[in-house]
């Protein structure tokens, strides 16, 4: 389990834990009385299950392992894109799993082709996410911590 402050504030922290090959995230408001914003869960990346088409001797496979190292093995498939792997530690909202960055694979890539690095910073969602984060900072909608 890890708990750390999120970008830009020290009031709402992100908790991440793994149980039975799934990651779980919650937001924890740490000021005054601690409170929790329940979050999402996602299956931990398993190459054989999630990417059965991947050539294990390819550059893409090497790139995944490099990304795994840099993300401390906090990887999952993007639920909206079966060819994108995300680092679940960082998201716009601390109780969400919409990775700020990731890598994009192609099942049609030749064996020497690299992955593509991607960022998830939608301008359309930014204002809505900032409103939600502000409500979290104020403690609106949280449940008391046990």
Q: Model-flagged regions — what are they?
A:
Residues 7-146:
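Extracytosolic and intramembrane catalytic regions of membrane-associated proteins
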Residues 4:
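Acidic carboxylate-rich catalytic motifs and surrounding loops in phosphoryl-/glycosyl-chemistry enzymes
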């Amino acid at each position: 389990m890890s708990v750390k402050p999120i970008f830009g504030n020290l009031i709402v922290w992100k908790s991440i834990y793994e149980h039975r090959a799934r990651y779980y995230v919650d937001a924890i408001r740490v000021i005054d009385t601690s409170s929790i914003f329940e979050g999402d869960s996602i299956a931990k990346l398993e190459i054989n299950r999630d990417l059965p088409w991947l050539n294990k001797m390819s550059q893409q496979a090497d790139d995944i392992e490099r990304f795994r190292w840099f993300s401390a093995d906090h990887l999952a498939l993007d639920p909206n894109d079966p060819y994108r792997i995300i680092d679940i530690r960082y998201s716009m909202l601390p109780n969400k799993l919409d990775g700020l960055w990731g890598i994009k694979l192609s099942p049609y890539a030749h064996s020497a082709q690299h992955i593509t690095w991607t960022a998830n910073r939608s301008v359309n969602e930014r204002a809505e996410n900032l409103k939600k984060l502000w409500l979290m900072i104020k403690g609106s909608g949280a449940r008391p911590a046990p």
